[in-house]
């Protein structure tokens, strides 16, 4: 009985997050309506507020739901392969996620667009996406037996920053036709810079 009610609560939270994502993407953060989110989720407004205290809580939950640094940065997988292979696996996972996940791209666009008016939301994104990835990659770069870098934190930022830039140009700004760059060529060149 308890697991059934727990599953219903999980399903309801998922429905709310799905409704919130649709509303935020359609209207932006400022114009998003809690009434429309509740309607899209098929829940009452009091139920919506019992799960998430408000619009900011909903947005934060969406960011946390979409953050998957653990999947991209699997420590055991990273440390058991030669450094070139480890970085390549990570880069391919990251870029595939970046290019293949339309909700993530939409959320990224929204955060960039709203960051001037809502810096707290942008900081929530940095805290939940960038910070964990950079911290974990810095640690892994320092631990990898095949790599000796002077500053693992700087190296992690260069690596992740290069991939984010590639994703922004190719996917968010639709630059494939203007600045074409084969993904594998980009990844191999980036890794050579780091490991040499």
Please identify what each model-predicted range represents.
Residues 1-43, 50-57:
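Basic, helix-initiating cap at the start of DNA-binding domains
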Residues 12, 55, 66, 87-90, ...:
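Hydrophobic/aromatic residues within well-ordered alpha-helical segments
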Residues 16, 54-59, 69, 121, ...:
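Short amphipathic alpha-helical segment with a characteristic S/N-K-E followed by hydrophobic residues
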Residues 142-191:
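Hydrophobic/aromatic-rich alpha-helical bundle segments in the mid-to-C-terminal region
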Residues 119-146, 188:
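Amphipathic alpha-helical packing segments from all-alpha helical-bundle domains
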Residues 18, 84-99, 105-109, 153, ...:
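Amphipathic alpha-helical segments that line or abut small-molecule/effector binding pockets
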Residues 60-93, 139:
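Amphipathic alpha-helical linker/stalk segments
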Residues 99-127, 168-173:
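Amphipathic alpha-helical segments used for helix-helix packing
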